[in-house]
Amino acid sequence: MKELNIALLGLGTVGSGVVKIIEENRQQIKDTINKDIVIKHILVRDKSKKRPLNISQYHLTEDINDILNDNSIDIVVEVMGGIEPTVDWLRTALKNKKHVITANKDLLAVHLKLLEDLAEENGVALKFEASVAGGIPIVNAINNGLNANNISKFMGIFNGTSNFILSKMTHEQTTFKDALEEAQRLGFAEADPTDDVEGVDAARKVVITSYLSFNQVIKLNDVKLVGISDITLADINAASALNYKIKLIGKGTYENGYVNASVEPTLIHKNHQLAAVENEYNAIYVIGDAVGDTMFYGKGAGSLATGSAVVSDLLNVALFFESNLHTLPPHFELKTEETKEMMDGAEPVVIQEKSNYYIVISNNNKSLEKVEYDIKKKLPFHKSLQLVERDQDTYAIIVTGIETSPEKVLNQSGFNIKKVYPVEGV
């Protein structure tokens, strides 16, 4: 039986999961790909470190050149993390005709197009299923399952830590601070939780998903970013009274050749599927022109969940190992001649979409009825308006079916706006 030699970069949480899955499912893997996977090298930072796995049969090295210069290595699996010098290692591996599998969202959010071009130039695969949503096979779904669709929008819960915190606040009336501390105790949140609670982790995944969905390269700075640290129980309870839940939603839309991307607290109607996604689970909702609405759900992190996605990529590469296939590009180019003309023109055509908003305003000692009356007079045409008392000083409002953000109009009319979040699933 042919052997498939792989090198593993990293033996932390995900790397250990990869080794465990390969060891425990070795016969099933052999039956699937008709090849035996051999882990020839494992790159670690400290060979003397004690590890939960028995790794005595593996060659551990602290020298990346042991891997890059080994011509027998077929696939490099990178689960070490970091951008530098990791990107240089992966570039060298691709140039040396080695397939690359990575779970590194930080790196891909910056260098995905560069690495994909290198893979194509060298006739090898670049796979990154684990980089977006752990065990959820969203990359394969978009690249292959939905490749007959023009995708116009995706939105989802991309970060399990923030979703766990919001679930605790919603169902147990826990404060943000206490929910975060529990997430840290359970290992869902890092000692420094900034990337999770301020939306940076989700934004990196939105950058990757935008490239997959729309075949457009955007940067992290292109993503509108608002975290959940300002969400209070007053917001949670006001949303509930209005029949909504608050989730940290990553979203991308594609119109006339342009991508709009965001990560921000969003009110999701309780009847929408995303509202039912709780605790550390992730879900991604994708809208295609042919298939309509689809949703992908599962655990977005963890040793075995993420390791499963890595090994899945490994098997997919192995199945096509003797062919000329390499990583599939995102679904066909969305820039038709018509949209190219729009993009090349001085004034791009903009499709006006109706939007929905959650707004918190000071009550200014006015009754709920008086505030509702005043807002209806000042706002441009809208579909519906709901108001509740948020706390003794503020009212919470949901306005739907409006063409422009109500923030400017209400500010000019003397309303003191405290917060504005989008609303979905109406």
Task: Cite the ranges covered by each PLM segment.
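N-terminal glycine-/serine-/threonine-rich beta1-alpha1-beta2 phosphate-ribose binding loop
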Residues: 1-95
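Flexible, glycine/charged-enriched surface loops at secondary-structure junctions
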Residues: 36, 193-196, 217-224, 320-332, ...
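Rossmann-fold NAD(P)-binding glycine/threonine-rich loop
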Residues: 86-92, 105-132, 139-142
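A short hydrophobic/small-residue beta-strand
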Residues: 99-101
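Rossmann-like NAD(P)H-binding beta-loop-alpha module
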Residues: 120-201, 208
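Catalytic, metal-anchored helix/loop core of enzyme active sites in primary metabolism
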Residues: 153-155, 163-166, 170, 182, ...
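Substrate-binding/catalytic subdomain of NAD(P)-dependent oxidoreductase enzymes
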Residues: 180-276, 281-283, 302
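A conserved regulatory-domain signal marking ACT and ACT-like small-molecule sensing domains
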Residues: 314, 320-426
